[in-house]
Every structure is written in C-alpha cells, then in structure tokens.
Regions:
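Conserved redox-cofactor binding core of oxidoreductases
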Residues: 36, 49-62, 93-226
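Short, solvent-exposed loop/turn and secondary-structure capping segments
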Residues: 21-25, 73, 78-80, 88-89, ...
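Structural recognition of the beta-strand scaffold that forms the well-ordered cores
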Residues: 12, 76-77, 169, 259
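Rossmann-fold NAD(P)-dependent oxidoreductase module
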Residues: 2
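FAD cofactor-binding and catalytic pocket of flavoenzymes
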Residues: 52-54, 58-66, 70-73, 77, ...
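N-terminal FAD cofactor-binding segment of flavoenzymes
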Residues: 6-8, 15-83, 110-119, 154-161
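A short, glycine/Asx- and small/polar-enriched loop/turn
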Residues: 182-185, 231-238
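Glycine-rich loop(s) and the adjacent beta-strand/alpha-helix scaffold that form part
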Residues: 5-29, 215, 224, 228-231, ...
Length: 322
C-alpha cells in the first residue's frame, strides 16, 4: 500500500487463492480438518515437518500453519494486536547474554517504532483501551474503543483480581464500530482460525489490499507461487521466477523485490535462490539463513464453566477472550 501510494508499480505474488467475504462460513470441519486455508499437512503434497534436534528424524505436524491465501495469516488470525515492549528490543543487554544463545539488541529504540505502530493501527482499525496495561508502550489512544467483554472474560477478570493479578482487555484488530466502509463486529464468535464474513476483522484482505488496489498501481496475482529470486551477472536482484495458476513457470522483472512470505517461507525462498556468489542461498554468507527465526507464538487453555450467564450469545471466539 505504501509503495503504490508513493507512485511505485507493485505486483503481489500469492501462492493461494483470493477469497471473498461470501466464502467465509462457520464450517468447523472445513477449517479444522480440510485444507480451506492451508494444504492439509497429511495430504502428501505440501507436508509440514518438525524435529527438535538436527540429528532427529522429522515428523509431520499440524502446528505452525499459516494462511495460504490473499491476506495470508491475517485472514484467520484472532486479531490480538500487542506491541513489543522495550525489553523485547534489549534482550541481550537485559540478560547479559546467555550461553549458546544468539541474542542481539535491536539497532533501534521503541521511540523509533511508536509512530509506525500508531500508523498501522489507524490504517487497519484496532480496538482497545489505552492506559490500562501497565506495560504498554503507547502515547495515543486506540483508533477504536474496546470491544464488548465476553461473560467468561468477566469471570476470569474476577478470578485474576482475587489472586492479585491485573487483567486488562486485549487490543484487537477488529472494528468495535463502523470504520471507513467496514461494519462493526457482530460478535458471532468465529474469529480465530476463521475468515470474517462480516468484514470486521482487520485482515490485510479487508483493510490494506482494497486501498492498495484503489491506487491503480497494485496488481494482486493469486495462485502464483514464487520459486526463486532472480539475479543478474553481478548478483543484483532483478526479479522473481514463479509458477502460475496453470502450473507454468513464469518470470517477472522488478527493480526491488520484497519478501513477505513469513519467517519460514521467506528463508526457504532465499535458500532456493543460490548463485555463484551465494552458493548457500541468496545473502547467506554467514550460514545463518533460516536459523534464529522469530515467530508469532501463542498459548491456549480450555476451561469448563457451569454458569448460566455464559449461555448469553456474546463472543469473539471461544479461545479469543480479551
């Protein structure tokens, strides 16, 4: 969006389909047991494997999946929109360095990031309440007021308070009221793992891509999988080789190539882009490409409440309590 607004001609290659809002339903079997957003890991044609140590045998897993569609993982995200803390940028300094850990301090400070956090939250539409998180790094209010509190979350808040903990509503990339052309959340309860049929979740599909297309300088090419980055005789990046929707190999020239395929897929693409100067993968002189990757991690828990008030049909997903 930023590049196209600045006057650059942009082509976006996406290996998955381009879904519309009408295709997002509450099909739990389709989401959890079929390959609506990602190729099913046990189907054989795109397996995901993991191993705890390099010498161990890899095994298939369903964990760590990302959306293979226009908008990527933001389409099926829960919409939690936390910011980094200052300590996240200074791990090496704070820990003094740990044995066998490749920690490094960021070359920028939180004050350098704050304007861009503010800009992104305003662009996509984030709901929240400023000033209640004692660890937050913000100087401005959220673009939108907080979402309604789920009855189960109120019980958790009470329990947390009785134990001396300070709970607070989670900032969500979900519109609590009308925002631009997008409607407010209808509290259907299907956020995490699902696409939003209401257009209220602030995925890039709902928020940024329409604006980028409106510039007339951004072209989205779905079902086109990048295969390697192309370089010239001087090892300068000159474009991308990709497989189109018909299974044919195509090439596209570009002055600038931006990799935005998640931590694993971006690293894999660079490893596949070997050259005479970079035999271990493009830009991989150190041999560290694909190592020390940073991911979006999360935890989850399940609880059963025997309380009548929880039968109220108000929710933002069973596991998506603020």
């Amino acid at each position: 969006l930023t590049l196209s607004e600045a006057g650059a001609k942009v082509v976006v290659l996406e290996r998955g389909p381009w879904y519309t809002v009408r295709q997002f339903t509450h099909d739990e079997v389709g989401i959890c047991r079929r390959d609506f957003f990602v190729p099913y890991p046990y189907a054989g044609y795109d397996p995901k494997t993991i191993r705890k140590k390099g010498e161990k045998k890899a095994h298939r897993t369903t964990e760590g999946w990302i959306g293979v569609c226009v908008g990527g993982g933001t389409v099926h995200m829960s919409g939690f929109f936390y910011r980094f803390k200052e300590s996240d940028l200074r791990l090496k300094s704070m820990t003094g360095g740990l044995k066998d850990a490749d920690l490094a301090d960021w070359p920028i400070a939180m004050d350098d990031l704050l304007p861009y956090y503010d800009l992104m939250e305003a662009r996509v539409g984030v709901s929240g309440q400023a000033g209640i998180n004692p660890f937050e790094t913000r100087k401005r209010p959220f673009p939108l007021p907080p979402l309604k509190t789920h009855p189960a979350a109120k019980l958790l808040d009470q329990a947390a308070g009785s134990l001396g903990f300070h709970s607070f509503p989670t900032p969500r990339a979900i519109t609590s009221r009308s925002y631009g052309k997008r409607p407010p959340c209808n509290y259907c309860g299907y956020c995490g793992d699902y696409g939003c049929e209401n257009g209220s979740k602030s995925s890039t599909l709902a928020s940024l891509i329409p604006a980028a297309e409106a510039t007339g300088r951004c072209q989205i090419k779905p079902d086109c999988m990048a295969r390697r980055v192309l370089v010239d005789k001087d090892d300068r990046v000159r474009g991308v080789e990709y497989i189109d929707s018909r299974g044919e190999v195509q090439k596209i020239e570009a002055r600038v190539v931006v990799l935005a395929a998640s931590a694993i897929e971006s690293a894999r693409l660079l490893l596949l882009s070997k050259t005479g100067r970079f035999p271990q993968g493009l830009g991989n002189r150190s041999g560290l490409l694909g190592k020390n990757l940073t991911f979006s991690t999360f935890g989850k828990a399940t609880a059963i409440f025997d309380r009548g008030e929880l039968e109220a049909k108000l929710g933002k997903g069973g596991m998506d309590l603020p």
